[in-house]
């Protein structure tokens, strides 16, 4: 299936890296952030892929570190009036969709996601309109507008079960936006699926050849892979799953050395769970200066201490997430379909990334 618009051929301009802070500057920002969180009745909610110092601060101040859906759920259930979402834009939108009555702020609204950027709502809607007999299933790593166009919103932890269910009902499926995850699901379910050709700039860079070479160096190591990675990389995995599932696998596998093919931001929480195990970054297609993301999302890196402080001090249009109410209500329908399906199966739904 070819697309007139092929996001897999797009080269995304990466944001500039934040200016490094001195240790004294870090301490000053941390103390100010702690005071502002109390003053503003706010809580820090951080994704696994943010920098370790951000995750540590979230935990230290009574906030939360988790995957995208867990973040939105935590914000929904916490008593704070203001949520500081440290992640990428769709995560802030997800929090607002589930908790419209709260102020949802982000360190920067320019923290994008290549899966979201690669799936513009207008182009995706045209694709769906061209196949009106297909059920539209989208990954949670999408904008509110794309979610609103879908029949189902899924996370990687339950995508297989939902697609199997739809396939058993004889449904043909449009899947978006991640082509690698879509191909993984298609292979494991045998479902008829039209795949949107988006990709995560981090996971797309992992190299099967380099991973095989690394495995030869560490034959006793287990390989943990996120399913947004290319099929050739997934084929080498001892465990495949979302961020939360990979952390769980790290605990359960007997291996003392783990090669991890996902954003290296996950090492902070994973190492907490397995302090006696050695974690090794899986190799990317490039090495050193020749890789682009180098196993760390450039937009996640924008969630720095200075930016968090600015969000708490300034708020407003530079930091606050707004979702059109009609769009919010419409996007809740496919999201609730997933949650209700999970409840019937008594599955605990985890997020994606």
UniProtKB/Swiss-Prot annotation:
Its EC number is 2.5.1.72. One of its GO terms (cellular component) is cytosol. The keyword Isomerase does not apply. Iminosuccinate binds at residues 47, 68, 139-141, 156, 226-228, 243. It holds the Pfam family NadA. Pathway: Cofactor biosynthesis; NAD(+) biosynthesis; quinolinate from iminoaspartate: step 1/1. GO terms for molecular function: 4 iron, 4 sulfur cluster binding; metal ion binding; quinolinate synthetase A activity. It is found in: Cytoplasm. Its main location: cytoplasm. Its cofactor is [4Fe-4S] cluster. GO terms for biological process: 'de novo' NAD biosynthetic process from L-aspartate. It catalyses: iminosuccinate + dihydroxyacetone phosphate = quinolinate + phosphate + 2 H2O + H(+). Keywords: 4Fe-4S, Cytoplasm, Iron, Iron-sulfur, Metal-binding, Pyridine nucleotide biosynthesis, Transferase. Binds 1 [4Fe-4S] cluster per subunit. [4Fe-4S] cluster binds at residues 113, 200, 297. Catalyzes the condensation of iminoaspartate with dihydroxyacetone phosphate to form quinolinate. NCBIfam families: nadA, PRK09375.1-1, PRK09375.1-2. Belongs to the quinolinate synthase family. Type 1 subfamily. PANTHER family: QUINOLINATE SYNTHASE, CHLOROPLASTIC (PTHR30573:SF0), QUINOLINATE SYNTHETASE A (PTHR30573). This is Quinolinate synthase. It comes from Photobacterium profundum (strain SS9). The gene is nadA.
């Amino acid at each position: 299936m070819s697309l007139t618009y092929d996001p897999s051929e797009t080269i995304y301009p990466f944001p500039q890296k934040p200016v490094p802070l001195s240790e004294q500057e870090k301490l000053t920002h941390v103390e100010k952030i702690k005071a502002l969180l109390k003053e503003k009745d706010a809580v820090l909610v951080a994704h696994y892929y943010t920098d370790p110092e951000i995750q540590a601060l979230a935990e230290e101040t009574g906030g939360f570190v988790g995957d995208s859906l867990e973040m939105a759920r935590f914000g929904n259930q916490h008593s704070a009036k203001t949520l500081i979402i440290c992640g990428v834009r769709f995560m802030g939108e997800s929090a607002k969709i589930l908790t419209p009555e709260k102020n949802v702020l982000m360190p920067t609204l320019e923290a994008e996601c290549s899966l979201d950027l690669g799936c513009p709502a207008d182009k995706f809607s045209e694709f769906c309109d061209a196949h009106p007999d297909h059920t539209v299933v989208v990954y949670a790593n999408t904008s509110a507008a794309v979610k609103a166009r879908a029949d189902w919103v899924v996370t990687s932890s339950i995508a297989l079960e939902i697609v199997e269910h739809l396939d058993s009902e004889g449904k043909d499926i449009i899947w978006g936006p991640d082509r690698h995850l879509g191909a993984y699901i298609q292979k494991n379910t045998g479902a008829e699926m039209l795949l949107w050709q988006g990709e995560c700039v981090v996971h797309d860079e992992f190299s099967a050849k380099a991973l095989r070479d690394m495995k030869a160096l560490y034959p006793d190591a287990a390989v943990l892979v996120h399913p947004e990675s290319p099929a050739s990389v997934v084929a080498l995995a001892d465990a495949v799953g979302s961020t939360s599932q990979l952390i769980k696998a790290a605990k359960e596998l007997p291996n003392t050395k783990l090669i991890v093919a996902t954003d290296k931001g996950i090492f902070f929480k994973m190492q907490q769970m397995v302090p006696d195990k050695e974690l090794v970054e899986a190799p990317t297609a490039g090495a050193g200066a020749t890789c682009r993301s180098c196993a760390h999302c450039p937009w996640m890196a924008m969630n720095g201490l200075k930016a968090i402080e600015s969000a708490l001090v300034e708020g407003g249009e530079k930091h606050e997430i707004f979702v059109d109410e009609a769009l919010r209500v419409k996007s809740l329908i496919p999201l609730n379909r997933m949650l209700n399906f999970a409840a019937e199966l008594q599955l605990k739904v985890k997020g994606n990334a």
